[in-house]
């Protein structure tokens, strides 16, 4: 076996029947990120990427949804001795002095149990790295995981692995949706809309220009996941007083009217509502959903059922410092249904500014410059 390292993509359980779409998205994201590759193909339940630069390619691929885990690994034939030998070599090179290690093997075994490989490889590493004080750990207590996955014909001994984004592949629903980003909750909802496989059109609603920097930074964490070289963003100025729960609810319902207008204009079937029963009253949610149905669109609520995991999503789009603000938003306590402001909706629609962003390292500055 040569010393070639591959990128190995592990689809989520929800994506295993959508692997062709995930392969398409992998090829697209590598081209967008200017990462050269020789092939992207399926091997059993995993996807094997032969890339010129596995490190940068794995980082690009891990922007995608539909992935449980991504690894850089060495390929070896699914043969007991060859797999044990490769784990011993790779694992030995990865270990530092005094580290506890855990050998974990999963997948399809032929003529042996995966546990047999784990035991044999662990024994070999202890013997060969005795001078380093390397010792086996347990499932609950280890410093380094030495992970290997077996397909029918091959074994993949991981040098590095990282957690994926979860969800299902972008565009796998074959439906389009409109979502709006106007604060932290709505940004997470937009992130979840894409994560649930919808082809998403994003609009940004702001009350004053001072909000734009923060909103654009959030957008910058979201748009690379749309698997497009260029993304069209639309900005609307919604001039509604920011103070108090009542005004916030008027603001949210006014944005709903803007989304409904844009959904009709662009023939978009689904409207993504940044609402959760954990935050908003049932009355408010029911009103919003009825408004969507009245306009012959279909509502989706990506945040429905998402509880404290919402904070993990917040960190994923760079909102660690905004978590106290999120917690404050969660304390909305009102059963009132505030109607949208027709005057402010009309003003916002007239203020619409559309810009095309070419995905790259300077997205934030490019977007803000285009809005001047």
Residue map of PLM features:
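RNA-binding accessory domains that recognize and position tRNA/RNA substrates
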Residues: 1-232, 239-245, 369-372
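Active-site adenylate/phosphate-handling loop in enzymes that bind or generate adenylated species
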Residues: 125, 133, 161-169, 173-174, ...
């Amino acid at each position: 076996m040569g010393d070639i390292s591959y990128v190995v993509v592990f689809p989520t359980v929800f994506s295993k029947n959508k692997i062709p779409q995930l392969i398409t998205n992998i090829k697209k994201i590598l081209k967008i990120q200017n990462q050269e590759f020789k092939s992207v193909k399926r091997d059993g339940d995993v996807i094997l990427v032969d890339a010129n630069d596995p490190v940068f390619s794995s980082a690009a691929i891990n922007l995608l949804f539909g992935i449980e885990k991504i690894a850089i690994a060495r390929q070896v034939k699914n043969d007991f001795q060859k797999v044990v030998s490769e784990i011993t070599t790779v694992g030995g090179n990865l270990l530092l002095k005094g580290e506890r290690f855990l050998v974990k093997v999963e997948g399809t075994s032929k003529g042996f149990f995966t546990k047999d490989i784990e035991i044999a490889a662990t024994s070999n590493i202890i013997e060969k790295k005795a001078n380093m004080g390397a010792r086996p750990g347990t499932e609950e207590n280890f410093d380094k995981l030495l992970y290997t996955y077996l397909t029918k014909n091959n074994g993949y001994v991981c040098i590095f692995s990282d957690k994926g984004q979860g969800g299902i592949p972008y565009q796998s629903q074959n439906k389009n949706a409109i979502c709006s980003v106007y604060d932290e909750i709505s940004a997470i909802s937009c992130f979840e809309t894409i994560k649930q496989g919808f082809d998403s059109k994003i609009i940004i609603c702001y009350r004053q220009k001072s909000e734009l920097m923060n909103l654009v930074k959030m957008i910058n964490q979201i748009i690379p996941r749309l698997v497009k070289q260029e993304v069209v963003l639309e900005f609307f100025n919604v001039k509604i007083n920011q103070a108090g729960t009542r005004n916030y609810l008027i603001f949210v319902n006014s944005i709903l009217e803007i989304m409904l207008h844009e959904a009709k204009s662009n023939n978009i079937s689904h409207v993504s509502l940044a609402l959760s029963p954990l935050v908003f009253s049932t009355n408010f949610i029911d009103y919003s959903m009825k408004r969507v149905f009245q306009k012959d669109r279909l509502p989706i609520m990506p945040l429905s059922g998402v509880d404290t995991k919402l904070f993990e999503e917040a960190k994923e789009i760079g909102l660690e410092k905004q978590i106290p603000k999120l917690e404050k938003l969660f304390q909305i306590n009102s059963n009132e249904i505030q109607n949208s402001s027709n005057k402010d909706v009309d003003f916002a629609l007239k203020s619409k500014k559309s810009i095309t962003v070419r995905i790259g390292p300077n997205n934030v500055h490019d977007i803000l410059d285009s809005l001047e």
